[in-house]
Amino acid sequence: LSYAKNDLTLQNGDVIRLTDNDQKDGIFFGSSFKVSGDKSEIIKLKVYDQLRYAKHKDIVVLENGTLKTLVQNMCAHLSLTMGTLEDPGFIIPTIADYEKAWLDHITQAISDTLIGPQEMYCIRDEYGAVCLWNMRNLQMPLVLGDESLVTGYSWEKSIDEDFYNRVKVVWKNESSG
């Protein structure tokens, strides 16, 4: 995201909304993580929605749960806003892990759900709400190909410098064993 320098000054952590005249049902809702500029006076922003926080590594335990349960636990633990969460009803294998990102666990649970009931699910942020959808419910009557209006693309690689995890200190209670 970029904009021409003017009286608007954005800082890291500022809320970024991309809407079409409707503050309740916009296109993007997130925060700025990086602000940069140069002599051209074009300000560049790196912005993320709340799924950026799903890269947080933590202790995750889930027994007899579903993909929906895992997403609910992540949202509760990371204080993320939940939206529509469709439940596949498939019990995923037990998770008992630490120092693995929430998003990695969810990706594995999506794979397990694809293998089990053979249904593909996706997790996405819909204007500030984490949603879990069965891909069948997201189909659109749209075809991208030779006869479409898609005429080009670009891509970039990054591992998002200066990203830090929280530090948890855990110790054994000597009196209770």
What do the predicted segments below correspond to?
Residues L51, E86-G89:
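Short, histidine-centered active-site or binding-site loop motifs used for metal coordination
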Residues P88-A96:
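Surface-exposed aromatic
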Residues L1-Y53, K57, G145-G152:
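Assembly/oligomerization scaffold segments
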Residues S111, E119-G177:
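Acidic, small/polar-enriched beta strand-loop surface segments
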Residues G37, G89, N137-Q139:
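Residue-level detector of flexible, active-site-proximal loop/helix-junction positions
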Residues K57-I59, I92-P93:
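Short, contiguous strand/loop micro-motifs
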Residues L1, V47, I59-G83, D97-R124, ...:
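Amphipathic, non-transmembrane alpha-helical segments in extracytoplasmic/periplasmic proteins
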Residues I43, P93-T94, G128:
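Generic beta-strand structural signal
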